[in-house]
């Protein structure tokens, strides 16, 4: 099931675009999987891709991309505690807000690169009692708002599970929101809330139905808050699930991801 309007495909054919995309959803719905597969598909089309790991609890995205985990970007600003101290003094936001970034500006020590895909990480929780993730959220909020893309560049943000990032204002800096839905009541309910939040900040959003089977496809489609916003249905693929389980680089090229890629390039 794909919403891929032929009019827009023809209208935008050959047009160079740039886009910042937030990939959202509940924990375990497949955000990292879709982000990885989409990044690879865009890169195969000659686009320059920045993947932003914005989930402090996720230790698998870099492996799905076949890369090493990059150094925490928060360290570039002196580390979590330094950022928190500056936040208390209202220095950090003022300083960082005035600084614009491009993909080329990201210091080499803070990204991994493979096959046209550059990966950066806001930061991870590395040990017990080290504090909250507010510093990483502040860094990402300012970074994505001040990131300037060139033609044929895409930034894909693999967001933390849930909707806290909306409260932090991170999504204000993106151009489009992808909401991943798995076959569960919790995922469907959260996707409705994310859709409402997206509309409240005037951001276009689309649904990706994930882990779809013949038995649940119709049920999922009918249960979605706004079915006209369903972009694609991604079938439950044993090969993808197996590679993810073993922490291997994803090698599959699902038709649904190819269709999603063409759809995003058309809007």
Where are these regions (language model features)?
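Walker A/P-loop phosphate-binding motif and the immediately C-terminal alpha-helix
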Residues: 20-54
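Inter-motif core of Ras-like GTPase G domains
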Residues: 148, 167-184
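Gly/Ala-rich phosphate-binding loop of Rossmann-like dinucleotide-binding domains
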Residues: 43, 171, 199
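N-terminal phosphate/diphosphate-binding loop that engages ATP/GTP or pyrophosphate donors
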Residues: 44-115
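Short, Lys/Arg-enriched N-terminal segments with co-localized hydrophobic residues
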Residues: 2-18
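Conserved beta-strand segments of the P-loop GTPase G domain that flank and frequently precede/overlap
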Residues: 121, 179-182, 208-210
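Cytosolic-facing regulatory segments adjacent to core modules
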Residues: 98-110, 119-157
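C-terminal lobe/tail of nucleotide-utilizing enzymes
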Residues: 6-7, 196-267
